[in-house]
Amino acid sequence: TGVSLEDIESATFERFPQLATRRKQLAGTLSGGEQQMLAMSRALGTNPRILLLDELSMGLAPIIVKDLYQIVHQLSQEGIAVLVVEQFARTVLGVSNKAGIMINGKIVREGEPNELEEQLSAAYLGKKSSNS
């Protein structure tokens, strides 16, 4: 890719400052959130046009989830397309510019996050929304 290891490391620690203090630690000894940050930084080191994230929040503390989704939002602002599969859809809607709801492997709704918010609430509560 023409990017030096030092540049990748510098960009990683700028985006994920928590990892800088853990630079000598084995990856397997990092916390769950730090392991997610490390996985994201590995992927970002390849300068992707799209980043796929599957259940980013799984097993993580809410404050870590918030931090990770702020990074997802920043990546989107930088022009990287980010596709997130997330069981806790509201978490993703706050940082998305387009979203879809999938049920049983099929996309049943697509649109702007604010449009889907009401439909999501209705789906959780088993009610029909005004947009159904």
At which residue positions do the language-model features occur?
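C-terminal boundary and immediately downstream tail of ABC-type ATPase nucleotide-binding domains
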Residues: 14, 101-110, 115-132
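Conserved ABC ATPase signature
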Residues: 26-30
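ABC ATPase C-loop
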Residues: 43-44
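Conserved catalytic motifs of ABC-family nucleotide-binding domains
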Residues: 47
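Walker B catalytic motif
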Residues: 55-56
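Helical segment within the ABC ATPase nucleotide-binding domain
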Residues: 65-78
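H-loop/switch region of ABC-family ATPase nucleotide-binding domains
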Residues: 86-87
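Conserved catalytic segment of ABC-fold P-loop ATPases
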Residues: 94-101
